[in-house]
């Protein structure tokens, strides 16, 4: 049985029809060009993990909460508490921007790649600039009040926000370099569960720079056009790509086993 997935067609070198790539595929390329190439050229994708349904529920509740203030064109209390001079942005396409399978879209004409990504929320400041907002949820002993240092796995979150900033700019919007993470941390210091989880929520900025996105898309296209499988990349938490490492070790073990069977 082939592990290739047929949700979309593999990329054909030189094709004239625009090819659709999500924000997550950009992140995949940044981590491991080999896994990216196998995905888009052969539709051999990484094994999927179970969905984080608790995180998804928190995202949806945050959206409902901010939408109430959006309808009234008023700042959310978290925005007031953090002296953020902005309100949730009202736009007819907001729900499309937030939907995973549509998102904010643009056709990158130099590569003929259709790039899209679903944003959690958008605010607008007093200067009329759009602010990209990303909701995050976790559970730790201490609340998350800032991202980890550059070079850590939190760089994934930085790149995520910067791609959304780039996408909005490609659609003609004035976008602030400063985005915000609304980070909810589940408390583990309480006496018991008692059928509920309490969260401590912090809002903190990220000063994004999306200059890297353009060159990365060009590099992705060059990778897609090549018939040579690129080198192995890195794992999200550092070190060599775990998926490529596993695939290589399992293949080597399988080949040794088959060779041994032939001898016997």
Feature annotation, model-predicted:
Residues 1-129:
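Metal-dependent nuclease catalytic cores that hydrolyze phosphodiester bonds in DNA/RNA
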Residues 37-38, 45-47, 140-143, 187-191, ...:
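Short catalytic/ligand-binding loop motif for oxyanion handling, primarily in non-cytosolic enzymes
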Residues 49, 76, 155, 240-244:
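Serine-centered coil/turn micro-motif
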Residues 97-215:
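Mg2+/Mn2+-dependent nuclease catalytic core
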Residues 1-4, 11-14, 20-21, 167-264:
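Metal-dependent nuclease catalytic regions and adjoining charged, substrate-binding loops involved
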């Amino acid at each position: 049985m082939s592990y290739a997935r047929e949700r979309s067609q593999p990329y054909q070198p030189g094709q004239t029809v625009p090819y659709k790539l999500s924000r997550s595929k950009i992140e995949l390329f940044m981590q491991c060009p080999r896994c990216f190439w196998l995905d888009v050229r052969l539709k051999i994708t990484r094994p999927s993990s179970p969905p984080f349904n608790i995180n998804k529920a928190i995202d949806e509740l945050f959206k409902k909460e901010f939408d109430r203030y959006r309808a009234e064109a008023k700042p959310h209390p978290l925005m007031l508490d953090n002296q953020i001079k902005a309100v949730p942005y009202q736009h007819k396409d907001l729900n499309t921007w937030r939907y995973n399978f549509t998102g904010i879209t643009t056709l990158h004409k130099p590569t003929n790649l259709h790039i899209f990504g679903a944003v959690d929320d958008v605010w607008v400041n007093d200067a009329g600039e759009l602010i990209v907002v990303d909701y995050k949820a976790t559970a730790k002993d201490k609340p998350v009040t800032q991202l980890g240092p550059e070079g850590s796995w939190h760089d994934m979150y930085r790149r995520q926000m910067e791609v959304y900033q780039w996408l909005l700019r490609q659609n003609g919007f004035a976008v602030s370099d400063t985005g915000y993470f609304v980070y909810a941390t589940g408390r583990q210091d309480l006496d018991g569960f008692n059928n509920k989880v309490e969260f401590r929520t912090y809002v903190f900025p990220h000063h994004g720079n999306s200059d890297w996105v353009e060159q990365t898309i060009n590099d992705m296209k060059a990778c897609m056009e090549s018939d040579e499988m690129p080198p192995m990349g890195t794992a999200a938490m550092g070190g060599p790509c775990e998926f490529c490492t596993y695939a290589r070790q399992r293949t080597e073990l399988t080949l040794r086993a088959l060779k041994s069977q032939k001898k016997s």
